[in-house]
């Protein structure tokens, strides 16, 4: 939580512009060469208790390199100082900022991992509920869609998950984000929401994860609601294994799948 990192080095072919919002910060990564006119809105992971870190700036570069995207990364407010709905409100405000900046919904891709993946889904549901322009696609890596920890994989993978397994002390049980709210509220746990009318979505998840069912059950509900859904379970992989970038074959395959999607 209190990790102090060295300054991030922005690759020479990019500009990374800080954007100061009223209650949070954002960073807009832009290729110096011509961009493709579309933007990835990145919502980072960290259990709603960790701020953005350099790994997600590297993620932004990786997203951009797929096809010269601009990438807006949101350093949203986090618990316990700022429980729900702070992060959710910041995600909405970031999306509105893109709309006001001239991006139509069909030129915006939502992408997130872990808590950020759940936030992607919650944001899409909110936009649909408010009849706002919907994004083009949703990309979710190991999304945390069920803050009640009720899915079967929380038990089945309890001893298999190298990150969250064998303990009840991990961030997936701390409850700080939901605070005094019902964790089954769809904007907190989008697994319990209405999936009708949502954009095409990609779920990637590792077979060893306690959060496996967060993706499997959400994808199932989305398909039943008529959504265009791709779910890929990567065998013997752990939570957000895509952080390995090119070091793991499975991570390379996952990033290739994101590019193809």
Features from the language model and the residues they span:
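Alpha/beta-hydrolase superfamily serine-hydrolase fold, recognizing
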Residues: 10, 15-261
